[in-house]
Amino acid sequence: MALAHSYSAIKDFEGCPRRYHEVRILKKFKSKDTEATLYGTAVHKAFEDFITDGVALPPAFATYRQFVEPLAQLDADIRCEEKMGIRADFTPCGFFDADVWFRGIPDYLAISKSGKTARVADYKTGKSSRYADTAQLELMAAMVFIHHPSVDRVKGALLFVVVGDIIKAEYTREQLPEILSKWAGRAAAIEGALDVGVWNPRSSALCKFCPVSSCEHHHGN
C-alpha cells in the first residue's frame, strides 16, 4: 500500500499512531468539524476571495485586512491554494498522481517577477502562536523548490491573524537535500508502522477530542 504523506498527516501520526491508522487508513472514523475549524475555513475562503478576486472581507474579518492586503498587493505571480505533489525520488508530480509521495497546498504562494524568490504563507486562526511550527513552512519551501526550479530562496510566514502575530522563516535551495532527508525520515516512521502492522495509541490531553471511540484512551471509555 502506497501512502501519500503531508504535513498534517505526519503530525497526526506523531501525535497518535492509532488515531492516524483508524482515521486516515482504515477510515473508520472521521474528524468532526468544530466551531474553531469552521471559523478557520471561513477565514481561508475570505482571504482567497480577497486576493484572487478582490472580494471585500466580511465585516467579521475586517481587522485581518492588515495581513491579507499586503499579500494581494505584492507585484508577483500569486497563487492561492496551489496543489503540489512530489514523488519519492524528489521529482515533481501532480497532487493526485498515483505515485505521489508528499502533498502540499500553501495557502498563499507568490513568485517574484525574476523567478528567483518565492513567498509562502499559511493562515492560522488559533488563539496563540506559542507552539508555532515552522516545519510546515519548511516542507512548503521544499515543494516550491522542486516545482519551480528557478526559485533559489523561499520566505515563509505563519500568519496568526487572531492574535496579530507573524512567525517567519527563510530557506535557500542549498538546504533542499537536508529538508528532504528530514521529511523522508519522518515519513519512514509511518511506512515502518504499515510494514509491521503496529499502530500503538499515544495518550494525551487531546484524547478528549479524538473521534476514535474504540480506543481505550477515548474520553468516553
Regions found by a protein language model. Name each.
Residues 1-2, 18-30, 116-121, 186-194:
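Short amphipathic alpha-helical segments and their helix-coil junctions
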Residues 2-56, 81-82:
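Nuclease catalytic cores
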Residues 2-15, 96-111, 174-181:
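An acidic intrinsically disordered interaction segment
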Residues 4-5, 86-92, 98, 129-132, ...:
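Metal-dependent nuclease catalytic regions and adjoining charged, substrate-binding loops involved
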Residues 24-26, 35-37, 59-62, 76-83, ...:
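Short coil/turn segments at secondary-structure boundaries
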Residues 42, 135-143:
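Short amphipathic alpha-helical face segments that pack within enzyme cores
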Residues 45-120, 126-130, 135, 147-157:
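Catalytic cores of nuclease domains that cleave nucleic-acid phosphodiester backbones
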